[in-house]
A protein has these predicted regions:
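Eukaryotic endomembrane system proteins
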Residues: 130-189, 198
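A basic- and aromatic-enriched beta-loop-alpha substructure that forms the phosphate/nucleotide-
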Residues: 100-142
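Juxtamembrane interfacial secondary-structure elements that flank transmembrane helices
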Residues: 64-65, 86-90, 117-135, 274-278
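Glycine-/proline-rich flexible loop or hinge segments
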Residues: 53-63
Length: 342
């Protein structure tokens, strides 16, 4: 999963003067706080992008444009924080700013880019293929005056949530303080993080691909492949990916606040915009439009967990395949590190 990661310096070496405290000589005590150094800049970026997206969504009557923003904005924020800010503050080139990052931070940045780019491409392709707004949003658009309050009720709150979710890949580039672990366990922690990322990325990608292929051939619910593990394997994969971002932080100076990132992402997927919203919409549509599909959904809800697989599902061949993808990711990352980071 690290095939986009270029050469770097050794993990236990200084990341260079560009990311060291001397260059932050003008920072006041208030600047090192997470609110001013990380959360507020992230919220400013996300809220600006959300406003532009809201205007475009209103003009096209497509609420789903906010879903395009979800992964792309996170990638943009990660790269702006890690590379863009040092470039603008110190007048340096892209290559110089990137070379200043230690290996693990390059892995983190690459993982965010790989995950976000694939998800954005998938959402955009699905949107173009469908030719209309996502079914989840058709009902809410019928509410009187929906677009007048949509920015404050939908777009802006998601910008705030994104600001917290992004902590695991913005804090490492904005705050120098943290807890350090021994050099002997750095490689182990990084390998674990890459393995979790590889498994989560593969699970999310497999879920999207299998669902798309299923819909080309049949009209009933997709309950095979990784969809036979849980009812929402794509959201589980996304959760694992964000957990891996926090784990990668532990392979360097670790600020515990980054844990809020995957926690916020999990809570959002479980209780706000993920499986809860999806199934509520499915139940409403299937009950009135497709009784057979509604019956399948009700049966599936009894047989399979929504988010976390049961113990018997852990030995499912597809679960083993996902775990194998995580192992392959570790091998690839280690190969690149041994080749370029020695």
């Amino acid at each position: 999963m690290a095939y986009l990661i270029p050469p770097s310096t050794l993990e236990n070496q200084s990341s260079s003067y560009l990311h060291s405290p001397p260059l932050r000589s003008n920072i006041t005590p208030g600047d090192v706080g997470i609110l001013r150094s990380t959360l507020l800049p992230s919220f400013a970026l996300y809220s600006s992008l959300s406003l532009a997206t809201y205007i475009a969504a209103d003009a096209t009557n497509r609420v789903e444009l906010k879903d395009w923003l979800w992964p792309s904005a996170q990638v943009l924020n990660a790269w702006w924080t890690a590379i863009g800010q040092p470039m603008t503050k110190h007048g340096i080139s892209f290559g110089t700013a990137y070379a200043a990052l230690p290996w693990t931070k390059r892995v983190l940045l690459s993982c965010v880019a790989i995950w976000g780019t694939r998800l954005f491409a998938r959402i955009a392709y699905r949107s173009f293929s469908r030719g209309r707004d996502d079914a989840r949003y058709e009902a809410v658009k019928k509410e009187p005056g929906f677009w007048k309050g949509a920015f404050l009720r939908i777009f802006l709150p998601e910008a705030a949530v994104l600001s917290v979710i992004s902590l695991s890949f913005t804090v490492p580039f904005t705050m120098d303080t943290g807890l350090s672990i021994g050099d002997e366990v750095v490689d182990v922690v990084r390998a674990l993080a890459v393995g979790v990322f590889g498994a989560g990325f593969a699970l999310e990608a497999m879920a999207d691909m299998q669902l798309a292929l299923h819909r080309q051939e049949r009209t009933d619910l997709c309950r095979h492949g990784v969809w036979g593990l849980v009812r929402h394997p794509n959201y589980l994969g996304d959760t694992l990916v964000h957990v891996s971002f926090a784990l990668l932080n532990m392979a360097g100076p670790f600020n515990p606040v980054v844990i809020l990132g995957p926690v916020a992402n999990y809570l959002f997927l479980r209780f706000l915009g993920g499986d809860k919203e999806t199934e509520a919409n499915q139940e409403e549509r299937y009950k009135s439009q497709d009784p057979h599909k509604y019956g399948q959904l009700r049966q599936w809800q009894v047989e399979k967990n929504s988010f976390w697989p049961g113990l018997r599902d852990l030995v499912n061949p597809w679960a083993l395949a996902v775990a194998g993808c995580g192992f392959i990711g570790v091998v690839i990352e280690e190969g690149f590190r041994c080749t370029y980071d020695m």
